[in-house]
Amino acid sequence: MAKKKEFRQAEVNIGMVGHVDHGKTTLTKALTGIWTDTHSEELRRGITIKIGFADAEIRKCPHCGKYSTSPVCPYCGHETEFERRVSFIDAPGHEALMTTMLAGASLMDGAVLVIAANEGVMPQTREHLMALQIVGNRNIVIALNKIELVDREKVMERYQEIKEFVKGTVAENAPIIPISALHGANVDVLLAAIEEFIPTPKRDPNKPPKMLVLRSFDVNKPGTPPEKLVGGVIGGSIVQGKLRVGDEIEIRPGVPYEEHGRIKYEPITTEITSLQAGGRFVEEAYPGGLVGVGTKLDPFLTKGDLMAGNVVGKPGQLPPVWDELTLEVHLLERVVGTEEELRVEPIKRREVLLLNVGTARTMGLVTGLGKDTVELKLQIPVCAEVGDRVAISRQVGSRWRLIGYGFIRE
């Protein structure tokens, strides 16, 4: 019987990315035992809508050398040894949810690109790989899933097709692991590849804490008596430093208010009353995994993900808030994610673009154009550092499509 280990927080975030229905959620379940689609509409439609997090311990058997997520080796029955705890981020693969995937991509330290053997490379496979390229994520493993649906020749054909597809991209040297998430086949080889190709980033715990908010909630049930109400909860991932229960925190850009007919945003400060990581209450939380931060905020401010896109840190230590941005822009040659090949037209003055900055998304009206720069007035302000990457999308038909990226300039 395996000994009970003390709880460890996940130390690395690994994205599950790829086209809709290629098996990202099934693979997450095969690795973690958790079905991340728990939203009622997700269960009804059978697709991921919100970003799901699921933690797993990667363990190695000292006897047969195989990797698994179980305390007892499923291959030889010996007790396994703990390697590290990781958090899998299950991102939506549906084209209409691309901006949600981009918010998740900003939190990923590495990614598993899932491609179904029966369908091969599809439009959102391209779009998700480009999203990883845009956020600068180079730690990638490719899972060629659903091999149970095709013969050996087809698997080899898909392997060559994928090799061709990733040439010249951040995934050019990524290993391609044939698996069946449904039957758990080759999952040990996939875990070995994750251990080799997706290292835990070196982090400085003494840096000022910074957490990107992905969601927020009111956890009080309807009809709770006033004396039993608890403050609003914000969920996200710490990207640097650490947070402790009792810390005073600032949230930027904060909450909207109206002044002279215009919407403005005001940063807010509050105190951390509880911290949850990996489903457990902890006194201190670090980068890695989804962290739930209990606060003294009015739950009205946090219900229904109202705080998503904010940045949390110590008062006075957060990056600036921008109402206008100057971006050094790099446009792609072709629009990503469409069936037909469309060239990316130059950005025009007065055009409205969709910008993803960390977990925040905002509309930007183009007010000025330089040789390689674009000036934009933002609909919702963002909290970001000079030099941060911004994903740029344009409306093509009825969908927002990735057309490039930029870096924030002074």
From Swiss-Prot:
<feature type="region of interest" description="G3">
    <location>
        <begin position="90"/>
        <end position="93"/>
    </location>
</feature>
<dbReference type="InterPro" id="IPR004161">
    <property type="entry name" value="EFTu-like_2"/>
</dbReference>
<feature type="binding site">
    <location>
        <begin position="145"/>
        <end position="148"/>
    </location>
    <ligand>
        <name>GTP</name>
    </ligand>
</feature>
<keyword id="KW-0396">Initiation factor</keyword>
<dbReference type="InterPro" id="IPR044128">
    <property type="entry name" value="eIF2g_GTP-bd"/>
</dbReference>
<dbReference type="InterPro" id="IPR022424">
    <property type="entry name" value="TIF2_gsu"/>
</dbReference>
<feature type="binding site">
    <location>
        <position position="73"/>
    </location>
    <ligand>
        <name>Zn(2+)</name>
    </ligand>
</feature>
<feature type="binding site">
    <location>
        <position position="61"/>
    </location>
    <ligand>
        <name>Zn(2+)</name>
    </ligand>
</feature>
<keyword id="KW-0460">Magnesium</keyword>
<feature type="binding site">
    <location>
        <position position="21"/>
    </location>
    <ligand>
        <name>Mg(2+) 2</name>
    </ligand>
</feature>
<dbReference type="InterPro" id="IPR000795">
    <property type="entry name" value="T_Tr_GTP-bd_dom"/>
</dbReference>
<comment type="similarity">
    <text>Belongs to the TRAFAC class translation factor GTPase superfamily. Classic translation factor GTPase family. EIF2G subfamily.</text>
</comment>
<dbReference type="Pfam" id="PF00009">
    <property type="entry name" value="GTP_EFTU"/>
</dbReference>
<dbReference type="InterPro" id="IPR050543">
    <property type="entry name" value="eIF2G"/>
</dbReference>
<feature type="binding site">
    <location>
        <position position="48"/>
    </location>
    <ligand>
        <name>Mg(2+) 1</name>
    </ligand>
</feature>
<dbReference type="GO" id="GO:0005525">
    <property type="term" value="F:GTP binding"/>
</dbReference>
<dbReference type="Pfam" id="PF03144">
    <property type="entry name" value="GTP_EFTU_D2"/>
</dbReference>
<feature type="binding site">
    <location>
        <position position="76"/>
    </location>
    <ligand>
        <name>Zn(2+)</name>
    </ligand>
</feature>
<feature type="binding site">
    <location>
        <begin position="180"/>
        <end position="182"/>
    </location>
    <ligand>
        <name>GTP</name>
    </ligand>
</feature>
<dbReference type="InterPro" id="IPR027417">
    <property type="entry name" value="P-loop_NTPase"/>
</dbReference>
<dbReference type="InterPro" id="IPR009000">
    <property type="entry name" value="Transl_B-barrel_sf"/>
</dbReference>
<comment type="function">
    <text>eIF-2 functions in the early steps of protein synthesis by forming a ternary complex with GTP and initiator tRNA.</text>
</comment>
<dbReference type="InterPro" id="IPR009001">
    <property type="entry name" value="Transl_elong_EF1A/Init_IF2_C"/>
</dbReference>
<dbReference type="GO" id="GO:0003746">
    <property type="term" value="F:translation elongation factor activity"/>
</dbReference>
<feature type="region of interest" description="G1">
    <location>
        <begin position="18"/>
        <end position="25"/>
    </location>
</feature>
<feature type="binding site">
    <location>
        <position position="46"/>
    </location>
    <ligand>
        <name>Mg(2+) 2</name>
    </ligand>
</feature>
<keyword id="KW-0342">GTP-binding</keyword>
<feature type="region of interest" description="G2">
    <location>
        <begin position="46"/>
        <end position="50"/>
    </location>
</feature>
<dbReference type="InterPro" id="IPR005225">
    <property type="entry name" value="Small_GTP-bd"/>
</dbReference>
<feature type="binding site">
    <location>
        <position position="25"/>
    </location>
    <ligand>
        <name>Mg(2+) 1</name>
    </ligand>
</feature>
<feature type="region of interest" description="G5">
    <location>
        <begin position="180"/>
        <end position="182"/>
    </location>
</feature>
<feature type="binding site">
    <location>
        <position position="64"/>
    </location>
    <ligand>
        <name>Zn(2+)</name>
    </ligand>
</feature>
<keyword id="KW-0479">Metal-binding</keyword>
<dbReference type="InterPro" id="IPR015256">
    <property type="entry name" value="eIF2g_C"/>
</dbReference>
<keyword id="KW-0378">Hydrolase</keyword>
<keyword id="KW-0862">Zinc</keyword>
<dbReference type="GO" id="GO:0001731">
    <property type="term" value="P:formation of translation preinitiation complex"/>
</dbReference>
<comment type="subunit">
    <text>Heterotrimer composed of an alpha, a beta and a gamma chain.</text>
</comment>
<dbReference type="GO" id="GO:0046872">
    <property type="term" value="F:metal ion binding"/>
</dbReference>
<feature type="region of interest" description="G4">
    <location>
        <begin position="145"/>
        <end position="148"/>
    </location>
</feature>
<keyword id="KW-0648">Protein biosynthesis</keyword>
<protein>
    <recommendedName>
        <fullName>Translation initiation factor 2 subunit gamma</fullName>
        <ecNumber>3.6.5.3</ecNumber>
    </recommendedName>
</protein>
